[in-house]
Regions:
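PLD/PLD-like phosphodiesterase catalytic module centered on the HKD motif
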Residues: 2-44, 48-199
Length: 199
């Protein structure tokens, strides 16, 4: 019989967030079976993130791309992805997958916290989505083996999922020269190269 690991709250430094989350999720998936293919309810990673630039979104995306996370990911984002941000297309495609993802439209729901649910007993809860996780240290709850905590997190996720809107289709398209318009003023610069005589 395995020893239960109680949930614990830790203050995580800004620069350590992504690495600590990646290690936490990898440990659950690889060592403790944090996500079970045999359990229909646990056959998805449930993710709530402020944006695709949040450390939790980047951590999950990296583990999907490397093949550590092989089950579907259901994602709720508070902020629409900025298509010009570096790596946003790769992160979005990894964390949205076949579920399409949802977007928070009611700003009152920004009081919800970032979180992950893996299987029936593992979860993580971060700061509320009003605060940018890339600007501050934060208290975070790591629950690697607590079905009660994971159950509460799962219920919160499902309720939020049901009242959020699907991500717009255009956000799910790869960013290319055709889909991403040039910055303001670029058209004028091309039409009138530097050094052109003024009329």
């Amino acid at each position: 019989m395995s020893r239960k690991v109680a949930p614990f709250i830790d203050i995580v430094r800004l620069e350590d967030k992504e690495a600590k989350l990646t290690a936490f999720i990898r440990t659950l998936v690889e060592q403790t079976g944090g996500v079970s293919d045999a359990d229909p309810k646990g056959n998805a990673v449930l993710l709530i993130a402020r944006s695709t630039e949040s450390p939790v979104a980047k951590a999950v995306a990296a583990l999907v791309r490397e093949g550590t996370i092989r089950v579907p990911v259901k994602t709720i984002l508070a902020l629409a992805p900025r298509q010009e941000a570096e790596g946003v297309s790769e992160t979005l495609s990894a964390i949205v997958g076949t579920h399409g993802g949802r977007l928070v439209r009611d700003v009152r729901l920004f009081d919800a916290h970032e979180q992950i649910v893996l299987g029936q007993a593992a979860s993580w809860t971060g700061d509320c989505m009003r605060r940018d996780p890339m600007k501050r240290d934060a208290f975070e709850c790591f629950a690697g083996d607590c079905s009660k905590t994971a159950g509460w997190a799962r219920t919160s996720f499902e309720r939020l999922w049901n009242i959020c809107e699907p991500l717009p289709e255009d956000l799910l398209q790869p960013v290319t020269a055709e889909t991403c318009p040039p910055p303001v003023g670029v058209e004028d610069a091309v039409a009138e190269p530097l050094g052109s005589p003024q009329v």
